[in-house]
Amino acid sequence: KKFNFNKPPINAKTGYIDTNILIKSKYILKAANNQNLLNILKSYFECSFKLDWVWAWWSFPSEELAGPQLFHRDYESMNFLKVFVYLSDVDEFNGPHEYVVGSHKVNKLYKRERFADQLIYKNFTKENILTIKGKKGKTFIANTYGLHRGLQPKNEKRLVLVYLFSVIPSNRSPKLPV
């Protein structure tokens, strides 16, 4: 359902921006082809890779949690990384990203489901949980097979852009060339 992101419906938790709009932006494609970024990805993958998908979404303050606001793993592909770009300032009150450091290397809690905080804290120490805050433009890379979530915004909405880079096509890959 389409709505104005400045006036979301009362029950809206998230709002996705149409990928077809994103891929037509020269700025978004230019950022994905930043040579420093590509060098980091090349070093990680040690083989050919491609930009597989790009998407962006708003997260709104809400009484209820949305699925991505619970710890989970992503299963897009066998070998992938995501590049996150905050398009709004993100502090502890408007939905910072949390990542369980080292969880991409272990198969604890590997089922395709969302996990309650208590289960995460039972299997990992609080010191393993990295909270990523930053100003608009903050960019970070994550292997999101590792347990992660975007915290629920409390005061302000959050806008994030995500690039998916993959060695093999993912379940998000376009079926036809873009």
What residue ranges belong to the model's regions?
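Short, conserved beta-strand element in jelly-roll/cupin
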Residues: 76-92, 133-134, 141, 164-168
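Short edge-strand/loop segments of extracellular domains
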Residues: 61-62, 100-107, 165-170
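Active-site region of the double-stranded beta-helix
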Residues: 47, 72-76, 87-96, 102-104
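Double-stranded beta-helix
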Residues: 92-147
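Non-heme Fe(II)-dependent double-stranded beta-helix
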Residues: 1-69
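Generic beta-strand structural signal
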Residues: 47-54, 67-69, 79-85, 95, ...
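Non-heme Fe(II)/2-oxoglutarate
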Residues: 5, 113-114, 139, 145-178
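Histidine-centered catalytic micro-motifs
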Residues: 68-75, 147-150
